[in-house]
A protein has these predicted regions:
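Conserved acid/base catalytic micro-environments in cytosolic active-site loops
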Residues: 1-91
Length: 92
């Protein structure tokens, strides 16, 4: 399954493995947030997730990728040469 989160909202996987799209939390800098999605997937599918981080600015995804890796999942990132902005892949 591939998840693509709609702008301004959060996409997460609940404990039963159900994908939920919720209103974005105004306290978070990013909506959607890769950290929210990856973190929830790490809890729901420990060790059975492939996280992919493509071009983007900032550090969103760093904490979620750490949780995925900690649980035994893989995280792939785009290489610097092909990125428009290497911020997110570099942060992971």
């Amino acid at each position: 399954m591939a998840l693509i989160a709609p702008g301004g909202q959060q996409t997460l996987v609940d404990a039963r493995g159900v994908v939920r799209v919720l209103a974005g939390d105004e306290r978070l800098n990013f909506r959607p947030s890769v950290d929210v999605t990856f973190g929830s997937a790490a809890r729901a599918y420990s060790g059975r997730v492939l996280g992919i981080v493509l071009t983007g600015m900032g550090t969103d995804g760093r904490e979620g990728a750490r949780l995925l890796k900690q649980g035994g999942s893989q995280v792939w990132t785009q290489d610097e040469a092909s990125c428009v902005i290497y911020g997110m892949p570099m942060a992971v």
